[in-house]
């Protein structure tokens, strides 16, 4: 097997594969034939610089076609792609290099200094540079499902980022979620907005669309809510994949409106508030299908395509995946997950994430095992509190954590970022408490409300609850 051969070379050469939109809105379209040729020639250049089967190639390239060419070139050779987000600093890159020892680096023109500052002594290929696409095309290596293909680092929500190694089967295995959750169809244009460098982008930016015969949209530039909607309309996007934070921001800060081209939308990476799901369905005309997975596992469950969406739920296990709840924790049988990382554990994989399952088999996320708040014997998921507070018009973003309490053991502490036009006050804090009591069970309301200008987050945008718990963020 070889992803480059099986899904790029084998596709109709005239079929649209990629649409790239630069920050200045310059536009580039590439067919599968063009991607096959350019990635094969780039693979020839990588091979000439010493990269081969099993070698790690680090990429530090933004959401542009050059990044896709580099990833596919690695897989053509049987090399291991290590995509890195552009937000990483030299110290972050150096730590990754020390862990996985890349043979060479493919870097865009804006981040050469960051790579140089690491002291990396191997070859560095700067893109765009047409000379790298002039080598003789490299033939696809014959690979097995367990041959390594991709190494990604966990986001470090609860500790130092660690590498996770995936095999060739991870790439072809994306067909499961692409069909049953992501929802790509032949001829679609799919836009996964995740930045290059994360596991979500590695599987959904172009792999998931391609295994279903669809095209992928790559857009450079910072997140701007109104521009996000403009791009969906201008490019006639069929399938949209965004982080819940982005869906919330677009709903609250942009002029959300009917999006006639958009047939399907998915969210993953953190829980999606029920009110945001409803707002998108009512205003944009599309139901957002939440999903769940991990860096180690790939997608595990998602809101099914077809039945009505259940706002607030992350759906059901994908077909064939054996997933269950044990003492409140999500567990899975690695043997049933086609995208599980190499060298799986003996026995079940305990995710460390907590959820409940209703009588219809739908899963409802509660939080990380160490995020669940135990107050006076009540088990409170932070997402429940956050969802309640997020429906208040003054709230832009919020996070709930436990705070020590002599009587109750712990109480709920909410840290709130306000929308423009609202100022922190004791009166507003009391108003938010009463709002939460009205929106959810009274025992869940935050007995402590604090205001902050922003929430501490990892480079991938996840809230650092541990930082909030120790009080250093406010």
Language-model-detected regions and their locations in the chain:
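Conserved pre-ATP/AMP-binding loop-to-beta segment of ANL
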Residues: 13-16, 136-153, 160, 183-189
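Conserved AMP-binding/adenylate-forming core of the ANL superfamily
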Residues: 14, 18-64, 68-72, 89-94, ...
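ANL superfamily adenylate-forming
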Residues: 22-24, 28, 104-146, 160
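Conserved AMP-binding A3 loop
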Residues: 28-33, 149-173
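Conserved structural elements of the adenylate-forming
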Residues: 36-44, 145, 164-185, 193-194, ...
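AMP-binding/adenylate-forming catalytic core of the ANL superfamily
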Residues: 88, 240, 325, 334, ...
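Conserved AMP-binding/adenylation subdomain of ANL enzymes
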Residues: 172-192, 196-239, 252-253
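Gly/Ser/Thr-rich phosphate-binding loop
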Residues: 237-242, 251-309, 322
